[in-house]
Amino acid sequence: MASQGTKRSYEQMETGGERQDATEIRASVGRMIGGIGRFYIQMCTELKLSDYEGRLIQNSITIERMVLSAFDERRNKYLEEHPSAGKDPKKTGGPIYRRIDGKWMRELILYDKEEIRRVWRQANNGEDATAGLTHIMIWHSNLNDATYQRTRALVRTGMDPRMCSLMQGSTLPRRSGAAGAAVKGVGTIVMELIRMIKRGINDRNFWRGENGRRTRIAYERMCNILKGKFQTAAQRAMMDQVRESRNPGNAEIEDLIFLARSALILRGSVAHKSCLPACVYGLAVASGHDFEREGYSLVGIEPFKLLQNSQVFSLIRPNENPAHKSQLVWMACHSAAFEDLRVSGFIRGKRVVPRGKLSTRGVQIASNENVEAMDSSTLELRSRYWAIRTRSGGNTNQQKASAGQISVQPTFSVQRNLPFERATVMAAFVGNNEGRTSDMRTEIIRMMESAKPEDLSFQGRGVFELSDEKATNPIVPSFDMNNEGSYFFGDNAEEYDN
């Protein structure tokens, strides 16, 4: 865990490894990616998918969801103990789309979970390869982050919907391990903690007995993860208070919401990694790419290079704009839902528009939609430049942002000033400043007030030409600072519903 003084790189978390050198990390990440690719190829063979059908992102997502379901131990156990009508706990499945006589058709498939586990293990040298499963979860989480807004969830826990830039990873399953914790935003963890505290307030036995002891350990562990994301001593000290509380209640909820707000200016470190759909890895493996030998990094040039030369298709609803669908998936691939649009647009080499202006719904197709009326089109996932993904909040400073989203959480390590509406955020800090955390609160507010809009974050960091694999010549972009920077501005996206 970050706070225990052992900072592992998130490639190491990703591969469950101990301290390794760079080459070993690149090889083990490559091994993980290659395993996903081999699994995908085998599933396409079993399902008799044509090359074109195998490149359809909707088919990729169905296959990914099947393997996640096959390995979801707790849910599988639950399903076996609580049988529900018409649901076979030993089977998993989903929609597969096939091209028949010039039309797309949906076929619902069912598979034995045991069979899918066999295919997955076989593709991963006989191992369970949990790292690969987590990688797939993070890709789904990034896709959700780009597609949906979490207004309802924020309001339910007493947070402000404008804090959406803190909600990265809010749909990641609990079982996503250290790699999952690394990509969760401050707001996501605050929300999990508040839910826990609220249960404790409503249920006297929540913290008691043997179960309560386990709950308490989980609570403290989550507090430590959140503490490890904060970069200032005062924020960390407040987290110690929350963690050590004998009987967490409303005071702790207040403290957590205060900390979440403070993270809009004093940003937490949240890891970003480019996680691509399984079909992209499958295509590369099928064309003879040896990921383990070549090595791979989730935060380097490799994902950009993969996307430069892989063709992925998507089903498009009759009134959707294929270019907008491409933007959505591009953002998901690079974990850039909360990045400044000016930065994303510069790297992509195309204008990136806010969520509210996109004429596209999510990638997945509901079972009641008519597939025959849909066409498929190529997703444009290429980029003009590449940049290193960051795991820090890029703190120094802030600047004017928009009505919908009042801060960003940077994805790319690229010099810019971070858009941010100081007046809006500071307005939330009037009032409650007494109690046991008052000195820390005062200190945090002071730091927020002294943050200067002109300051540059990621000083001297730039983007790179795609031919510059060793990242030797940074190109530092200049941005029009008055331009709209946030994605969820004026938002009308659908809510995320499980």
UniProtKB/Swiss-Prot annotation:
Motif Bipartite nuclear localization signal per record, residues: 198-216
Keyword match Transport: no
SUPFAM superfamilies named among the record's database cross-references: flu NP-like
Ranges spanned by the short sequence motif Unconventional nuclear localization signal, renumbered to the chain: 1-18
Keyword list, A-Z: Capsid protein, Helical capsid protein, Host nucleus, Host-virus interaction, Ribonucleoprotein, RNA-binding, Viral nucleoprotein, Viral penetration into host nucleus, Virion, Virus entry into host cell
Record InterPro entries: Flu_NP (IPR002141)
Cellular location(s): Virion; Host nucleus
Residue segments, region Disordered: 1-22
GO cellular component terms, semicolon-separated: helical viral capsid; host cell; host cell nucleus; ribonucleoprotein complex; viral nucleocapsid
Post-translational modification as stated in the protein's UniProt record: Late in virus-infected cells, may be cleaved from a 56-kDa protein to a 53-kDa protein by a cellular caspase. This cleavage might be a marker for the onset of apoptosis in infected cells or have a specific function in virus host interaction.
Positions with biased composition (Basic and acidic residues): 8-22
Single GO MF annotation: RNA binding
GO BP, sorted A to Z: symbiont entry into host cell; viral penetration into host nucleus
Pfam annotation, one family: Flu_NP
Subunit structure: Homomultimerizes to form the nucleocapsid. May bind host exportin-1/XPO1. Binds to viral genomic RNA. Protein-RNA contacts are mediated by a combination of electrostatic interactions between positively charged residues and the phosphate backbone and planar interactions between aromatic side chains and bases.
HAMAP family tied to this protein: INFV_NCAP (MF_04070)
Family per similarity comment: Belongs to the influenza viruses nucleoprotein family.
Function field: Encapsidates the negative strand viral RNA, protecting it from nucleases. The encapsidated genomic RNA is termed the ribonucleoprotein (RNP) and serves as template for transcription and replication. The RNP needs to be localized in the host nucleus to start an infectious cycle, but is too large to diffuse through the nuclear pore complex. NP comprises at least 2 nuclear localization signals that are responsible for the active RNP import into the nucleus through cellular importin alpha/beta pathway.
Name this protein carries in UniProt: Nucleoprotein
Organism, scientific name: Influenza A virus (strain A/Swine/Wisconsin/1/1961 H1N1)
